[in-house]
């Protein structure tokens, strides 16, 4: 990681841009560079400024990506996964779509912004982190506690992100509906957690004289979880997602939205994968992922929990306490990070929409940006307390996220 950060720092230095690598562990760290606004609020208004621009000027724009990647088994790859082999217009390698490609895209945009000398109404930061794939203890989590220079006084990384707008990983892959390529933009994430139920035998213990009631109750708990339908909520992002795709299916009709009709139409034209994503964006889920039976006296049931933005720890505790009481079990919330939803229309995302139409549209085909709620989890989860608006967008041409990970040149 440090070698990659050093390389990025050299590129920035060649363009006269200062940056700093905040070392979080030997050979690991996070790089930050800044292009300051062309003016500051106390210096008066810039050209043609209005109240909306005044509000935006208070919020920095942060281009964020991570330089680390997950492991790769070379025998499963067509080309060595860390060789960045170029073949037939593609670059093959681990990280080409998660997220070295985003690092390159954001670095290029950052350099272009510095070179063209255009008026900037706010500070723009480039942040390249490490350790995202392993929990971010040495990455963004560590950076948030760093002290960084900012004008007249130093601030923490946490303060830097307060009320900021962030472009990070997530989305960018297109789905085709009619003659339109919709490039998905992650404007939110579901909350992610892990819950552990422990069901102990109530009656005689031991394999010879035991009643097996602990295991029986554990299996009933599993069946109960599997048949539950948790609360649902239609988020603004999801309503916009369904309505826009339905309009495209209907040939551009802009009539009154009907959620039931929208869902039915989309079910017919979307792929099975996209239908699953759409279903998940509309509901909370709890899924049993592991059953552990040390002995006949105790069974553990491990569950993955995905909650829509707006459902937090309090809702999760009420849900798990109810199940634990029903089946006479103990329950622990092992981990939980709250979800979030950023504004799905206007502002920064409006700028991304315009750029998508201009840069990715082709003859006979339209390109549009379409916000969605992700079921996965990334560094955006750390920014919920700071009320940052986080958008995951790294648009790519044809790509492959499996073994032989590759991105079009």
Whereabouts are the PLM-identified features?
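Structural motif
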Residues: 60-62, 90, 164-166, 389-390
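Conserved hydrophobic/aromatic beta-strand scaffold that supports enzyme active sites
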Residues: 30-34, 166, 196, 290
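Acidic/histidine-rich catalytic neighborhood of metal-dependent amide-processing enzymes
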Residues: 91, 97-186
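Fold-independent oxyanion-binding glycine-rich loops
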Residues: 25, 65-67, 88, 130, ...
